[in-house]
Amino acid sequence: MAARVLGQMVLAVLMASAVAGVAIAAIARVEWPAYNTSNQLHALTTVGQFGCLAGLFAAGLLWRRGRRTLARLGALAFISAFSVVTLAMPLGATKLYLFGVSVDQQFRTEYLTRLTDTAGLHDMTYIGLPPFYPAGWFWLGGRIAAATGTPAWEMFKPWSIVSITIAVALALVLWAAMIRFEYALVATAASTAAMLAYASTEPYAAIITVLMPPVFVLAWAGLRARTRGGGWAAIVGVGIFLGVAALFYTLLLVYAAFTLTIMALCVAVARRHIDPLLRLAVIAVISGAIALLTWAPYLLAAMRGEPADSGTAQHYLPDAGAELHFPMFSLTLHGALCMLGTVWLVVRARTSTRAGALAVAVVAVYAWSLLSMLTTLAGTTLLSFRLQPTLTVLLTTAGAFGFIEATLAIAHRYRPETSRRVVAAATAVGAIGAVTFSQDIPDVLRPDINVAYTDTDGTGQRADRRPPGAERYYREIDAKILEVTGVPRNQTVVLTADYSFLSFYPYYGFQGLTSHYANPLAQFDKRAAAIEGWATLGSADDFVAALDELPWEPPTVFLMRHGANDTYTLRLASDVYPNQPNVRRYHVELDSAVFDDPRFEVSDHGPFVLAIRKPGGKPETDGH
């Protein structure tokens, strides 16, 4: 059984990759109008979604008629195509992914750029440091970009879509291994649609999110196995999943571990036996071993006692993190489905493995949210608002099962002929509901899609064909840096507040976007204090001396903006949690006189001023 499922998972990965790759390439060959100026892409997305949902329905009919191999292949193809058309078609006229290269996507693109430039595990920004944020998704995408010769910023979109599509196909395989094939189709389609609508902006989170419902069901079955020898394949599989989660997204790993701990404790208490806790320990060992693939370098550096800050990654409390989220009370079609799922969980939690697992997972989200609010007393949070997409996917999946069971319960009250009509009517309602929700996904994502068209990409162009931003000067800035320094990009440290420059080119940065994204080993606050101190200097000698005395590799390139009174400015950020917004922006003004020296070459590029410290004063540093 386990070997067969593993083989099906390999096939799913290959099919999803092929479907996504071919579809993305085909869409890219056409000259489309921009999504934010035309409805054509939305219209074609709707047509594609309708075709994919019809294909899934046909796969279910083939299964009932005994054409099971063809049904499995068709289902994998159509669920993959559904994921691709929903994301790739609205983005068909841009090279950027959802939310472009703005805010969070800025540092994600920077991370992918770093791991495209090198196969080694390096921090996205700081030279000589191991990565603090999980590198798994970025490393895989970086290797693909390097192998194909594609710029990392341009690979971000196709890799996001392909990896999400692979996860969707794997979810179908897992569901089909545990429940009836037709039910697996419904559950996967529902959870996929919810994930695409509410989690796809963060692709590596979306991957883990769509796989959580079947994995939690698998875990619940494994932890509740009645015999000592039973359920171990499930335990090993869950351990591998948690290990992959550790490589992709720390928060979802911790939430999943929290949920599994609740499950194990519930079973151990109910049966008055320690076996579920031992199985949980096995899961922890397996996942921990896998996690070390990317976490080991950072942990070793921390154990060596290298200077580090406490980190501020959890210093964020938006409105969504200060209240509990109840999607079942939304007055929408999706809200009604979540309400149906909630009712199903309450009614069936004690009698259904699926309902029991999903109920514990939902309760765990709310428990995590309350704990997050309490941890504000300790000066931090648990970022519970980031679990809202997870909660939505869990309730949507439960709603799909609730719809199926409600339909069957009603049908069983009537004679066979009437019963078939009830099922047919419910199928029609479900299909219409699926199309209705699916065609609204681009509208849910519209703000993120629009940014993908209005941001300036790595070629210096905007996809909506309007005048590009200041980023259009990045190419000539990059050429100037290479000309003056004479070393590869990964041997140069750049100080800039225009962080998207580091998203497009693999230079190291002297300071990160904010402390929330910064490696704790980088000592963000001390670097900020050093930069602020340079504002008091008035001569090149003092400035060069200050650079050479830094405990870190000093910047040799300064990408700044013109300020008033012969100054060059940098716009930096400081953490002001628990205030909201949690970041305070401020300007540091450097006297232009500190760069007025033969040791620096200064040039203007549009709104930018570029100051480069000429080689000769410092030994070369190998960024790898």
From Swiss-Prot:
| Listed Pfam families | AftA_C, AftA_N
Its transmembrane ranges are 5-25, 43-63, 73-93, 127-147, 159-179, 181-201, 203-223, 234-254, 280-300, 326-346, 355-375, 391-411, 422-442
Catalytic activity field: Adds an alpha-D-arabinofuranosyl group from trans,octacis-decaprenylphospho-beta-D-arabinofuranose at the 5-O-position of the eighth, tenth and twelfth galactofuranose unit of the galactofuranan chain of [beta-D-galactofuranosyl-(1->5)-beta-D-galactofuranosyl-(1->6)]14-beta-D-galactofuranosyl-(1->5)-beta-D-galactofuranosyl-(1->4)-alpha-L-rhamnopyranosyl-(1->3)-N-acetyl-alpha-D-glucosaminyl-diphospho-trans,octacis-decaprenol
Q: Which InterPro entries match?
A: ArabinofuranosylTrfase_AftA_C (IPR020959), ArabinofuranosylTrfase_AftA_N (IPR020963)
Sample GO molecular function, one term: transferase activity
As recorded in UniProt, its EC number(s) are 2.4.2.46
Keyword Transmembrane belongs to the record: yes
Protein's UniProt name:
Galactan 5-O-arabinofuranosyltransferase
**Species:** Mycolicibacterium smegmatis (strain ATCC 700084 / mc(2)155)
